[in-house]
Amino acid sequence: MKPLNIIFAGTPDFAAQHLQALLQSQHNVLAVYTQPDKPAGRGQTLRASAVKILAEKHHIPVYQPKSLRKVEVQENLSKLNADVMVVVAYGLILPLAVLQTFPLGCLNVHGSLLPRWRGAAPIQRAIWAGDKKTGVTIMQMNEGLDTGDMLHKVCCDITPTETSTSLYTKLANIAPKALLEVLDGLEQSLFKAEVQDESLSNYAEKLSKEEAKLDWSLSAEQLERCIRAFNPWPMSYFVTQDSQGTLQTLKVYQASVLPHQDKPCGTILAADKRGIQVATANGVLNLEQLQPAGKKPMSARDLLNSRADWFKIGQVL
């Protein structure tokens, strides 16, 4: 088993953790591709990606093309003479010319048990849908969206209190090891490629702020999953009205499900030390930790101590 010469393509912290694992392995990272620096923060100063920061720390050449479709970009990639390209949350489409550049192909690390969730938000959609388990798939890339042949899968449970933040951490802990196992056996074809079953695929649509608004016509169970799935972004929220008639927006960090009461959806049933209880299509959603605009997250009890007028019994949200 000889060391492989690798081009790594990735952008966020999740990708950087895989790059770190490669740097600590027997394999050679020849170069890194990552998205261009982007404005961030109040000052909108350009900020480098987590992958770029790590690569520069280890004196690895960094390339940041806006697209991989240009011929000169593809020629530069080919001149690096790598055995394989490893892609983790890169954010750019790989055209066929790039996919055909490397003798051992392009490997992708995807945060779901394919073909269950293809697309941009597999971690969040697994929680949103109520899946009991998820995992990571290492696949050989093709021109489709997460449709390539699967080489290796590793699983993990989704707990009843799992948020996207905690699940992201779980997957980041198990995925790099799975990637290295595949790379170590790639030349010997130790992992048999498995074609995905199209009938089992779902599209993990990108999250939006609009979707994050709590829809009381859904069930309490669905809403509780949304709250966990949309944490840390875009954060589930709802709007209420104070005694002056001013609209107040609150993000929800934690909630639980209580037995159903036959009241119109969105009706505030109770507001006490246990939480703020709201009727839904099926079951009651008990809001336990919330964040008013401009404030830190707080318990329902603490919020009610100062803002009880925001939550009148019988009020419909």
Swiss-Prot record:
Gene Ontology MF, one: methionyl-tRNA formyltransferase activity
Known EC number: 2.1.2.9
Domain of life: Bacteria
Residues bound to (6S)-5,6,7,8-tetrahydrofolate: 112-115
Keywords for this protein: Protein biosynthesis, Transferase
Any matching Pfam family: Formyl_trans_C
UniProt-listed InterPro entries: Fmt, Formyl_trans_C, Formyl_trans_C_sf, Formyl_transf_N, Formyl_transf_N_sf, Formyl_transferase-like_C_sf, GART_AS, Met-tRNA-FMT_C
GO cellular component: cytosol
Enzyme superclass (EC): transferase
Reactions that this protein is recorded to catalyse: L-methionyl-tRNA(fMet) + (6R)-10-formyltetrahydrofolate = N-formyl-L-methionyl-tRNA(fMet) + (6S)-5,6,7,8-tetrahydrofolate + H(+)
NCBIfam families associated with the record: fmt
Role description: Attaches a formyl group to the free amino group of methionyl-tRNA(fMet). The formyl group appears to play a dual role in the initiator identity of N-formylmethionyl-tRNA by promoting its recognition by IF2 and preventing the misappropriation of this tRNA by the elongation apparatus.
Alphabetical list of PANTHER family matching this protein: METHIONYL-TRNA FORMYLTRANSFERASE (PTHR11138), METHIONYL-TRNA FORMYLTRANSFERASE, MITOCHONDRIAL (PTHR11138:SF5)
Family the UniProt entry places it in: Belongs to the Fmt family.
Name listed for the protein in its UniProt record: Methionyl-tRNA formyltransferase
Source species of the chain: Histophilus somni (strain 129Pt)
Gene: fmt
